[in-house]
From Swiss-Prot:
Gene (name only): panC
Annotated positions binding ATP: 30-37, 147-150, 176, 184-187
Organism expressing this protein natively: Chlorobium phaeobacteroides (strain BS1)
Location of the protein in the cell: Cytoplasm
Pathways involved: Cofactor biosynthesis; (R)-pantothenate biosynthesis; (R)-pantothenate from (R)-pantoate and beta-alanine: step 1/1
Name of protein: Pantothenate synthetase
UniProt xrefs under InterPro entries: Cyt_trans-like, Pantoate_ligase, Pantoate_ligase_C, Rossmann-like_a/b/a_fold
Length: 288
């Protein structure tokens, strides 16, 4: 595995791979690698001859009250995990190389990024999309793999790629979960042992929503009421939002209609740790 820190070197390496007709896949991370990231790398390796892993803790997608300074940065451990997973190139630039002093341009992500995570974290999606665009250009990837746990982020990236006619296919990968259903996340390390036990209410609430769906309940208000009850059973849980949206446009819906994919979106603070998760809800025509 080759480790690259310089953006110009990364771009030249990617150009050389393209000239050799290598199919390139990129997996973008902020480091602190875990099983979820490894599943993205595995998916990339199944589809590409060359896999680039990027590790970059992007200052532009953290708000002033968020955890940029304390975000874990175990680069040596990450590099070892990446090597074992079969990554070909690890691109780990310093922030000043991605955002030099003269850097001025930023992506404006528009309507899809104004709600939910966008409302809770102003500027987050613009900062995220800016670095994703830059990393797509530097990696020259044919394919980019992102986790479905960050569902709104995935939707914003797909919208940007469509709008700018970027010749990279965006592939969503299923959320990887612990044995008790908690979505694997780098931020889980912030949870105390008691908070970790309580964090399972996110997955439990999604299971409750699906139970209601099987009972032919399609009223979103009633489903969310039940979801909220499950989450509220955890004494340290504070709900930021719990809502159901149409997966195609991230707009809230009142009634679930047949054969349309909806997402139950959750953002919940357990103690001081903010967790997000989502699950697909779909009513089949035969169940109506």
């Amino acid at each position: 595995m080759q480790i690259i820190n310089d953006p110009t070197e990364m771009q030249k390496t990617a150009e050389s791979l393209r000239l050799k007709h290598q199919f390139i896949a990129v997996v973008m991370t902020m480091g602190a690698l875990h099983e979820g990231h490894l599943s993205l790398i595995k998916l990339a390796k199944e589809r590409a001859g060359s896999v680039i892993l990027t590790i970059f803790v992007n200052p532009r997608q953290f708000g002033p009250e968020e955890d940029f300074q304390r975000y874990p940065r175990p680069l040596e451990k990450d590099a070892s995990m990446a090597r074992s997973a079969g990554v070909d190139y690890l691109f780990a630039p310093d922030p000043e190389l991605i955002y030099p002093e003269a850097f001025q341009t930023q992506v404006s992500t528009g309507d899809i990024a104004t709600r939910f995570e966008g409302a809770a974290r102003p500027g987050h999606f613009d900062g995220m999309a800016t670095v994703v665009l830059k990393l797509l250009l530097l990696s020259k990837a044919h394919l980019a793999v992102f986790g479905e746990k960050d569902a709104q982020q995935l939707a914003v990236i797909k919208q940007m790629v469509r709008d700018f006619n970027i010749d990279t296919t965006i592939l969503g990968a299923p959320t990887v979960r612990e044995s008790d259903g908690l979505a694997i996340s780098s931020r889980n390390i912030y949870l105390s042992s008691e908070e970790r036990k309580q964090a399972t209410v996110l997955n439990e609430s999604m299971c409750r929503a699906r139970e209601l769906l099987h009972m032919k309940q399609t009223d979103c208000k009633l489903i969310i009421e039940e979801v909220t009850k499950v989450i509220a059973s955890a004494p340290d849980a504070i709900i930021d939002y719990a809502t159901i949206v149409d997966e195609s446009n991230f707009r809230e819906t009142a009634i679930l209609k047949p054969d349309i994919n909806y997402l139950l979106l959750l953002a919940v603070k357990i103690g001081s740790t903010r967790l997000i998760d989502n699950g697909v809800l779909r009513v089949s025509q035969q169940d109506v």
